[in-house]
């Protein structure tokens, strides 16, 4: 399965230092051992189209072999630390899980 998360950072966190800290936090998430592969991304510079949403600041795509592996990730201390450290940084977060 795939776990996709989109983050919109608060305006006051849109500076290079805070963005670097946020990227470090995301990269730490990828150390959870049930992850098969993971990617951190920013919006692509594609043409503006009515169906394309490029308003988010960061996205992650995390792949797991099983739903159980995903559940381990959700309850993992590394995930808990990320949420605790950064939950006040985002204005909005969206999760889209694919089977």
Q: What are the roles of these predicted feature ranges?
A:
Residues 85-99:
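Charge-dense polyanion-binding interfaces
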Residues 1-57, 61, 65-72, 99:
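Short S/T/G/P-rich N-terminal loop/turn motif that feeds into the first structured element of a domain
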Residues 64-88:
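C-terminal structural segments of small proteins and small subunits
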């Amino acid at each position: 399965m795939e776990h996709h998360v989109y983050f919109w950072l608060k305006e006051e966190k849109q500076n290079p230092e805070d963005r670097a800290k946020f990227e470090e936090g995301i990269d730490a998430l990828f150390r959870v051992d049930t992850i098969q592969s993971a990617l951190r991304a920013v919006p692509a510079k594609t043409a503006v189209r009515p169906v394309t949403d490029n308003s988010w600041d960061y996205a992650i795509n995390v792949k797991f072999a099983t739903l159980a592996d995903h559940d381990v990730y959700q309850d993992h201390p590394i995930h808990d630390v990320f949420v605790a450290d950064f939950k006040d940084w985002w204005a909005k977060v969206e999760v889209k899980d694919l089977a």
